[in-house]
Every structure is written in C-alpha cells, then in structure tokens.
A protein has these predicted regions:
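Short, internal strand/loop/helix patches
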Residues: 122-169
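Short active-site neighborhood of thiol/selenol oxidoreductases, capturing the structured segment around
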Residues: 62-86, 90
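Conserved helix-turn-beta segment immediately C-terminal to the redox Cys motif
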Residues: 68-69, 85-109
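Thiol-based oxidoreductase modules, predominantly thioredoxin-like and allied folds used
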Residues: 103-116, 131-140
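Thiol-/selenol-based redox modules, centered on thioredoxin-like
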Residues: 159-203
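Bacterial N-terminal signal peptides that target proteins for export
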Residues: 2-16
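C-terminal motif of bacterial Sec signal peptides marking the signal peptidase cleavage site
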Residues: 25-28
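Bacterial signal peptide processing site
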Residues: 30-32
Length: 203
C-alpha cells in the first residue's frame, strides 16, 4: 500500500510540473504577441523595402531608418483633409511618446509627383515635424510601389489641367525597429491609439 501511495504521489508531482510548464509556455506566448488596436500584419510578404528620393534629393531605403519605428503614409500636398490630418496626428504621436518619440520616423510618399516638387514637399513637411521626410518617385516607379504596398490612387480631373484631385488609400504602414512591417493603422484611429501601439513595438 505504501508503494502505491508513493507512486501516486510521484505521478501527481509530475502532472503538476507538466501543468505548470504548460501554463508558463502559454503565458510566454501571450506576452510575445501584444494586442494591437491597429491591424496586425506581422509576417506580411509585401512592402518590404523601397527606393525613393526624399525632399532633400537623397535616395532613401527602408534600411536607412534601422533602429526606428517607421510610419509611412501615401498622400499629396493639395489633399484637403485626410493627408494633413494624418500627418498632424503622427506629429502628436511623437509628442505623446516622449523621449521614445525621437525614434519614430514619419515618411510621406506623394501620389502626385506631377505637382509635388521637392521644394513643395519640403515646405509641406515643415508644417508637421522637422524630422519628417517626404518621398517622391517617377510615375512609373510609383505605380510599382503602389502595387507592392497595395495602395490605391487615381487622378480625378478638375476644371483645368492642373486643378485635379487624387483619390487614394487612407492609412499608414508601421514598421518596427528591425524594419519589419507590423501594423496597418486606419485613417481616423487617432494619435493616442497609434502612440499606444508604437509603445508596444518599442518593448
């Protein structure tokens, strides 16, 4: 009888240890995958890099910003609402993050290279944050980039040849400090929501 009790006791200890280990592993897994408010696109096989010229004339790649969280928005300078709102909110995100805000790089890719000259883009970025960069491509490069990023844009004719507007996707792509695409944040989510998500990426 004593032999049976010792075996039962040993089996209970083994079972408890296995349960504790499983719980620890599950806990570890849950900690590795934080709950983002934005759309989690971790592991996406698109939008991995780019080669564009910034408003200072320097050729840029995603790898240039290693160590920073990169937020990319596609828009144009004559956009009346979505674009300035998105860039203003991104500037607010930097403020909300305090010192970590210095490790956030805002990038604005114009979908209107015909009108958005480097000089105009530079002046436009100055309205939001001095560290933000505007990026520009040729119409052919832009078409390929938009396909890779799954971005929609289309010229809408106006009353004159230069008074057209641009329909385009509204949202931002967020990369972690290792240059991996992690999030897509929808337009209108707000600065506080994006700041909280970026804070999780810095952990």
């Amino acid at each position: 009888m004593a032999f049976s009790k010792s075996w039962a006791s040993a089996l209970m200890k083994v079972a408890f240890a296995a349960f504790a280990m499983s719980a620890a592993l599950l806990s570890g897994c849950s900690e590795q995958k934080p709950a983002f408010a934005s759309v989690d696109v971790t592991g996406a096989d698109y939008a991995k890099n780019f080669e564009l010229t910034d408003h200072n004339g320097q050729v840029r790649h995603l790898t240039d910003f290693a160590g920073k969280v990169v937020v990319i928005f596609f828009g144009y300078t004559q956009c009346p609402d979505v674009c300035p709102t998105s860039m203003t909110e991104l500037a607010e995100v930097k403020t909300l993050l305090g010192k970590d805000g210095e490790r956030v790089q805002g990038l604005f890719v114009t979908v209107d290279p015909e009108r958005d000259t480097p000089e105009l883009l530079k002046a436009y970025m100055a309205n939001f944050d001095p560290s933000f960069l505007a990026l520009r491509a040729s119409p052919e490069q832009l078409a390929l980039l938009a396909k890779d990023y799954k971005v929609y844009y289309k010229k809408v004719p106006g009353s004159t040849a230069t008074s057209y507007t641009m329909d385009h996707s509204a949202g931002s792509y967020v990369y972690d400090t290792k240059g991996q695409l992690r999030l897509f944040t929808r337009y209108g989510s707000g600065a506080k929501v994006l700041a909280a998500d970026i804070a999780l990426l810095f952990r």
